[in-house]
């Protein structure tokens, strides 16, 4: 399938993409957290931020920026530490709000939803490993002799985004269903938020120690 567009072993790629999307990460956790705390609207706004951020990174990977980042340690470290700092900021904010017994979002609906989208977008964009991953993964399924490899890259990128959309939609709908139950269980909600905050701190530590 799509062999005429320079895509190799598409079905193998699709299986690999599904497994990759299922691996827990900060983006997935952020979407799930907001679907529980802010409902389906908050969850899908977070997902939109992730989708746009990933699309930008995929385009940059195709444009050759990934090679620049890989061969320029200073640039890689700048993006890496910015991402780690932002993850630490999100985790600390969640933990602080949980300990104080407050909601980590503001009371105003519009600023809250706008902030969710912006945080998800920044979270997605400040991950230098993602852009390097897209190149190393996609290149295995692209025929370098194809006349238009950009089309091949677009097909693979779109497939990954669709798989991600399906999985995140499942998380958002599931999170929305348990929202009412969580809100009636104060202690359970506090424990859940604390674990989410700690996981973000853990993701920050892991990103800060990664090498290009």
UniProtKB/Swiss-Prot annotation:
GO terms for cellular component: plasma membrane. It is found in: Cell inner membrane. Its main location: membrane. It holds the Pfam family LysE. InterPro entries: LeuE-type. It is a multi-pass membrane protein. It catalyses: L-leucine(in) + H(+)(out) = L-leucine(out) + H(+)(in). The keyword Transmembrane applies. The chain crosses the membrane at residues 12-32, 49-69, 71-91, 122-142, 153-173, 188-208. It comes from the Bacteria. GO terms for molecular function: antiporter activity; L-leucine transmembrane transporter activity. Exporter of leucine. Belongs to the Rht family. This is Leucine efflux protein. It comes from Escherichia coli O1:K1 / APEC.
């Amino acid at each position: 399938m799509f062999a005429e567009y320079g895509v190799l072993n598409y079905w193998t790629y699709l299986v690999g993409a599904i497994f990759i999307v299922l691996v827990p990460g900060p983006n997935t956790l952020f979407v799930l957290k907001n679907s529980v705390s802010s409902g389906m609207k908050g969850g899908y706004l977070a997902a939109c931020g992730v989708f746009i951020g990933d699309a930008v990174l995929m385009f940059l990977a195709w444009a050759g920026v990934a090679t620049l980042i890989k061969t320029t340690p200073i640039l890689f470290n700048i993006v890496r530490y910015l991402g780690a700092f932002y993850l630490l900021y999100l985790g600390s904010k969640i933990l602080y709000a949980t300990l104080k017994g407050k909601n980590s979002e503001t009371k105003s609906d519009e600023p809250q939803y706008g902030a969710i989208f912006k945080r998800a977008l920044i979270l997605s964009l400040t991950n230098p490993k993602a852009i390097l991953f897209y190149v190393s993964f996609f290149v295995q399924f692209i025929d370098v002799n194809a006349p238009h490899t950009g089309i091949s890259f677009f097909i693979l990128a779109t497939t990954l985004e669709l798989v991600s959309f399906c999985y995140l939609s499942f998380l958002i709908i599931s999170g929305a269903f348990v929202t009412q139950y969580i809100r009636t269980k104060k202690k359970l909600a506090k424990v859940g938020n604390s674990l989410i905050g700690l996981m973000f701190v853990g993701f920050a530590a892991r990103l800060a120690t990664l090498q290009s």
